[in-house]
């Protein structure tokens, strides 16, 4: 899944 909002934050999994 994603990590936090927005889901396309740096260092997070690209979910967009």
Curated annotation (Swiss-Prot):
Using the UniProt record, give the first listed, main subcellular location.
secreted
Please report any disulfide bonds recorded for this protein chain, giving both cysteine positions: 2-16, 3-12, 8-15
Q: Which residues carry this modification: Methionine sulfoxide?
A: 9
Spell out the molecular function terms from Gene Ontology: toxin activity
UniProt keyword Secreted present: yes
Tissue specificity, in the record's words, reads:
Expressed by the venom duct.
Q: Where is it located? A: Secreted
Record keyword Secreted present: yes
- Family assignment? Belongs to the conotoxin M superfamily.
The name on file for this protein is: Conotoxin SI.13
- Organism, by scientific name, is Conus textile (Cloth-of-gold cone)
